[in-house]
Amino acid sequence: MYTLKFKIDEYNLNFTLKPSFVSSLYERKSPFHWIKIAGLYAKEISFKQINDFLEVYTNCNNKELILYESGLWDEKPSSRISKLSGSLKEQIKALSELFPGVRLSIAPHEFNCIFIAVILSKRTNYEVFVRKWMKNIWNNWQCNPSIIAKLKDIKNIGTSYQLIDLIKTMNDYLKINHLSKNEEEARRILMLCWGVGPKIADATLLFTRKAPWIVPCDVHLQRISRRLGWIDYKIRLPLKYFCLKYYCDECISKYGPCLKEEIKRLFPGFGGWIQTLTYLFGNTICKSINPKCKLCHSILREYCYKFSKNNNLR
């Protein structure tokens, strides 16, 4: 193996890999040290952040792949924040101070692995289960949809319904002849698969394409958008039925915007990065029940409806 050394600025390896589905292909060996254990170049790529440098130990001569998976291809947080103004700029700057150095780690060359990881993440603990499942799926079947679709069961890995559902979804996925380069078309094609809704399709595309404007809408994004006053409480999550029946413009004209369209409007060009920030925030501090308001940024508390209500400030 040889070593590559990158000078880094506004970058945090843990905050970049942890919220990305690319992390399902990695194992954290120690603080700020991740080793690839599944996918292309498994056991041949290792990232280690040491102060202001990212060291990459690898046999991979594809520098582009390394930049994608490390997240170093992505724009600096301050560059994105500079495009905002007013209260939104204040809030996103505060979020970025709580979770500094967040970039988007993507893997365009690992579509099958990422798609499988996203499917398995439905209503389960990602850190506890999905990581373990992905390691076993790679070791047994190299994330090959053709092999997985033919399995009668997957009990040697686990009995959770997510694993059973994976076989059904892979059967539909194999019927796809071509996945369009156009994100909206690709999204619709993926949603033709059993068990794949807007969130799964969008998350798969966000982490396999250079498209930071794609917005997977989860409960964290919805909750934080409401609490910070970005959206009205009536704004709905994207619905598979509507997403397949209508193109976005037509759906908005008939039923009004969904959360995805509102986030795209508020944060043009980088809604996926915003979703990543809110995932980190919602998973650790701004929880649905018993949020840890004392750990929150003072600026965010000023704007938060939940904090104001709990403290009789409004």
Which residues fall in each region the model found?
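HhH-family (HhH-GPD) DNA N-glycosylase catalytic core used in base-excision repair
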Residues: 1-314
